[in-house]
């Protein structure tokens, strides 16, 4: 069998593209090739004849020129006749089109790349293709968990506990403290942040006040800035962030968001099916949600280009002790838009655990923080009810791993 035997670095200026090359190269493809060259280097050599006529590699040459590369590796194909050269130029492009993909293995490989913070777009697949690949057709459902009833039960979580809930992790701690995130993340990076911080409205239900919900404006900014800064440090460079908030504190949220290193792409609106009665002359029927990503990074998008900033989802049945509780389908919507299956989704204000349940239903992994021991209990019990078992539930406490049954049985009576 005849084969090539010599490779040289050849100045691009000496190469002669084939004038009748029928293969076209779109600007999008050239951009992908340029990204590939920057990441991997020029690995796949150009095939040429002894007159420096290009047989294969026209697209790579165009990308190299735009990258300012002056010499490229070339392999000489001495054994081809003129007719064989013409045929190979066509065959090299056409036969590649006959190859297919084992989509299950492809998903596994791309998920493993994202797990180590590697940009999946560098594989050559664009965002729409990745969206189709990971579209599992899952429709998240409301679980109707009774938060109010659970809050009345004895508390078994202690501050500092790290709960292992299947693949998910929950720490009972302070989101303004960097060490809380260090313990929670255990070396991993978040592929997405979606969170619902306190709104600073001084709400009080039958279970008591929501923590960190009544501060002076300056202190509330500092609170948000510290929390946002900690989030930014543990996010992958291509991770997006969604922050639900109250318009009455919109200025503090936006200032802290920007100061912590996030680019604000826009503000989405959750439109509820009915208004919420309050003291304002205009009754609120919506909640805003900041959307952005790290200023020093970029973002991933795994759906189409027809998604609106208006999100219409019914609010859940009343849970009086967590008035801003989000419906599961609402949270699943941005989760599926901005992450792939098996991605790590961070929620530093876990609340009643809606983000964790949305992650469980959409095959994501939730890492979450909650300051209030009572609401940590809610998250644990809500997860158990969702999966129907406490078999894979344990807590890391004082250096020991304890099963759920042992911890729950030691809760004091009220």
Where do the model's predicted regions map?
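Core catalytic lobe of class I
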Residues: 2-376
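Polar low-complexity intrinsically disordered regions
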Residues: 1, 106, 410-414
């Amino acid at each position: 069998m005849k084969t090539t035997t010599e490779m040289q670095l050849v100045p691009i200026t000496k190469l002669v593209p084939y004038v009748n090359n029928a293969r076209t190269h779109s600007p999008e493809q050239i951009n992908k090739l340029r990204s590939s060259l920057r990441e991997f280097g020029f690995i796949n050599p150009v095939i040429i004849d002894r007159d420096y006529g290009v047989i294969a590699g026209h697209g790579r040459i165009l990308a190299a020129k735009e990258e300012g590369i002056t010499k490229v590796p070339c392999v000489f194909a001495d054994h081809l006749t003129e007719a064989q050269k013409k045929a190979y130029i066509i065959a090299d492009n056409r036969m590649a089109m006959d190859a297919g993909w084992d989509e299950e293995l492809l998903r596994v490989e791309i998920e493993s790349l994202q797990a180590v913070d590697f940009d999946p777009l560098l594989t050559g697949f664009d965002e729409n293709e990745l969206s189709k690949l990971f579209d599992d057709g899952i429709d998240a459902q409301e679980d109707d968990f009774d938060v109010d009833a659970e809050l009345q039960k004895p508390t078994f979580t202690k501050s500092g506990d790290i709960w292992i809930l299947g693949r998910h992790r929950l720490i009972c701690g302070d989101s303004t403290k960097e060490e809380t995130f260090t313990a929670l993340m255990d070396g991993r990076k978040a592929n997405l942040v979606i969170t619902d911080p306190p709104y600073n409205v001084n709400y009080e239900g039958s279970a008591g006040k929501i923590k960190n919900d009544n501060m002076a404006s300056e202190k509330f900014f500092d609170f948000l800035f510290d929390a946002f800064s900690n989030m930014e440090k543990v996010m992958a460079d291509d991770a997006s962030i969604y922050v639900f908030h109250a318009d009455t504190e919109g200025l503090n949220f936006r200032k802290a968001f920007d100061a912590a290193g996030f680019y604000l792409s826009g503000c989405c609106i959750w439109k509820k099916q009915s208004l919420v009665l309050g003291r304002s002359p205009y009754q609120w029927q919506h909640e805003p949600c900041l959307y952005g990503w790290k200023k020093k990074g970029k973002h991933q998008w795994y759906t189409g280009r027809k998604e609106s900033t208006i999100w219409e989802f019914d609010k859940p049945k009343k849970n009086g002790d967590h008035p801003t509780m989000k419906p599961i389908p609402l949270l699943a919507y941005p989760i599926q838009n901005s992450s792939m299956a098996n991605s790590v989704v961070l929620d530093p204000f876990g609340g009643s655990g809606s983000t964790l349940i949305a992650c469980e239903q959409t095959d994501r992994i939730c890492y979450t923080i909650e300051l209030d021991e009572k609401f940590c209990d809610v998250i644990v019990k809500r997860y158990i009810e969702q999966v129907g078992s406490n078999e894979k539930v344990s807590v890391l406490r004082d250096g020991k791993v304890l099963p759920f049954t042992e911890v729950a049985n030691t809760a004091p009576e009220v």
